[in-house]
Amino acid sequence: MNHIQGSLIYEGKAKRVFACENPNRVLIEFKNDATAFNAKKRSEIDGKGRLNCKISAALFKLLELNGIPTHFLELQSETFMIANKINVIPLEVVIRNIATGSLCRETPINQGTILNPPLLDYYYKDDELGDPILTERRLKLLDLISTSQIEKVETITKNVNKILKEYFDDLDLLLVDFKLEFGFNSLGEIVIADEISPDNCRFWDKTNSDPKERILDKDRFRQDLGGVIDAYEEILKRIERDSSNSS
């Protein structure tokens, strides 16, 4: 079903959110903008919005089929999705299966270390503050959500990790880590929001042992490795191939 695009509600680094005729729904546009290091590094990559929109839609559908609540409703076009309107919780929830990135910069943990159990971290979502990491006590001090809601978010995140790890393992991809955002829908239920794509997930190709060539996510942009679109296309291709085999 096509929805009429209304006024701009919010514009972030990678997406625009528009009102639509149903006040409980929004239209989300995925942009081609690429940013890293809290937008200190910027570029525009043709086709990125389309790929992230389609990948996110496929993964939201997968999660919904497995009983995980998300804001996703349907694709409007290759770069627009229709979603339930939510009140965003200003938290970024990161779960790590393999050590890389900031974890290795900030601790003595070696790159590539398997984290068992996976490490779950909270960050306060605020660009001006640099999205600082939150200790358990700071999280409680901010009082963004209740203790029971924190437990709900952790349970959902761990379940998502289990589902996606197994799913991508079958696609010869290692799910290194990923970030989730959450919000409350009109019924007051906690649901996954934002996106799930190579912009906020790290994927390593299991069929490639080269530490740079195996990267199939936004680290290609962060590290100036090139081939960003090729990497994102490869993720979508494997997802679509799996979908074709399953149907």
UniProtKB/Swiss-Prot annotation:
Q: Where is the signal peptide?
A: none
State the SUPFAM superfamilies in the record: SAICAR synthase-like (SSF56104)
What is the enzyme's main class? ligase
- Keyword set, alphabetical order: ATP-binding, Ligase, Nucleotide-binding, Purine biosynthesis
Query: One of this protein's GO BP terms?
Result: 'de novo' IMP biosynthetic process
Molecular function GO terms recorded: ATP binding; phosphoribosylaminoimidazolesuccinocarboxamide synthase activity
- Catalytic reaction annotation: 5-amino-1-(5-phospho-D-ribosyl)imidazole-4-carboxylate + L-aspartate + ATP = (2S)-2-[5-amino-1-(5-phospho-beta-D-ribosyl)imidazole-4-carboxamido]succinate + ADP + phosphate + 2 H(+)
> Its pathway?
Purine metabolism; IMP biosynthesis via de novo pathway; 5-amino-1-(5-phospho-D-ribosyl)imidazole-4-carboxamide from 5-amino-1-(5-phospho-D-ribosyl)imidazole-4-carboxylate: step 1/2
The EC number(s) attached to this protein equal: 6.3.2.6
Protein's UniProt keywords contain RNA-binding? no
- HAMAP family assigned: SAICAR_synth
Annotated family: Belongs to the SAICAR synthetase family.
User: What is this protein's name?
Assistant: Phosphoribosylaminoimidazole-succinocarboxamide synthase
